[in-house]
């Protein structure tokens, strides 16, 4: 059996366990040490580093690992950029119906929506959806231009209580993820604060927060969902870059009203900028932590 096949079997087993756990009430089992041991084993197995924050927003139960380890933010910044656009619209500074010209000369790689609209106009709402649901990089750059550039994402992060996240560059340079480079980085702890604020807190008004959640529920790039039982879904934003950098952050929603804040940041320790992304690991991590949070 190949390594990938073994991983898929393990994810399937963990999802089954999560489905059982999701239906069990009462006190949670003791989990901190066993989960921590399993996370360390996953790091050894795949030669990766894992930053994780997972919390039940109703009970307060949580699991953490390498909370303050620095990771490349990659496309998880798009959640903040879209939230800032919504905030500006709420304050009357812009309108979501404002139209933006998509210049073919400004297209960057991984822009499936804007490539098809090159030479035409898109509304800010459409750009938000493209950035959040397809991780469209040109759409993200147009949102950055609207809100004031990368520094505006850093400022927004600070305004919602995230004291660590910083965005320095534009797509696609921000995904270089060079080990030790502080540019365009965050931590699991910081993103947990920020994503909780924009999706479950008061960073946005209820209507704007609801719109952001709806957009993110329609995400087509989610890695978390592979680790969730039937009946669950997410409002999340992925990110990936060099050195195997692979992230996912957002909220998982259960069929009985459960809400779990999940932030997973990973990278390879192989020192290879072309290292394979770790999307399957994100699903595996989701399935691993879910039963212990319920």
Curated annotation (Swiss-Prot):
What is its EC class? hydrolase
Q: Which residues bind substrate?
A: 237-239
Q: Which UniProt keywords apply?
A: Antibiotic resistance, Hydrolase, Signal
- Say if the entry is tagged with keyword Repeat: no
Q: Give the reaction(s) catalysed.
A: a beta-lactam + H2O = a substituted beta-amino acid
Entry-linked NCBIfam families: bla_class_A (NF033103)
- What name appears for this protein in its UniProt entry? Beta-lactamase
Species this protein is from: Mycolicibacterium fortuitum (Mycobacterium fortuitum)
> Which gene produces this protein?
blaF
């Amino acid at each position: 059996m190949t390594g990938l096949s073994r991983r898929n079997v393990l994810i399937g087993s963990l999802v089954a366990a999560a489905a059982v756990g999701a239906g069990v009430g009462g006190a949670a089992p003791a989990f901190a040490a066993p989960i921590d041991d399993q996370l360390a084993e996953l790091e050894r197995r795949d030669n990766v580093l894992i930053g994780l924050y997972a919390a039940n927003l109703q009970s307060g139960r949580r699991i953490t690992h390498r909370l303050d380890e620095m990771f490349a933010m990659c496309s998880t910044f798009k959640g903040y950029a879209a939230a800032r656009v919504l905030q500006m619209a709420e304050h009357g500074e812009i309108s979501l119906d404002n139209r933006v010209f998509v210049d073919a000369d400004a297209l960057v790689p991984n822009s499936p929506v804007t490539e098809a609209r090159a030479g035409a106009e898109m509304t800010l709402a459409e750009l938000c959806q493209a950035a959040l649901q397809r991780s469209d990089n040109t759409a993200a750059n147009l949102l950055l231009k609207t809100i004031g550039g990368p520094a505006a994402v850093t400022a927004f992060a600070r305004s919602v209580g995230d004291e660590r996240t910083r965005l320095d560059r534009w797509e696609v340079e921000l995904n270089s993820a060079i080990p030790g480079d502080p540019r365009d980085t965050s931590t699991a702890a910081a993103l947990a604060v920020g994503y909780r604020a924009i999706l479950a807190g008061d960073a946005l008004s209820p209507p704007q927060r609801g719109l952001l959640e709806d957009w993110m529920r329609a995400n087509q790039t989610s890695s978390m969902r592979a680790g969730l039982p039937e009946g669950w879904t997410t409002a999340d934003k992925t990110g990936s870059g060099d050195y195997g950098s692979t992230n996912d952050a957002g909220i998982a929603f259960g069929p009985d009203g459960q809400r779990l804040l999940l932030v997973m940041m990973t990278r390879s320790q192989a020192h290879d900028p072309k290292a394979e992304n770790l999307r399957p690991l994100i699903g595996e991590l989701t399935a691993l932590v879910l039963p212990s949070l319920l």
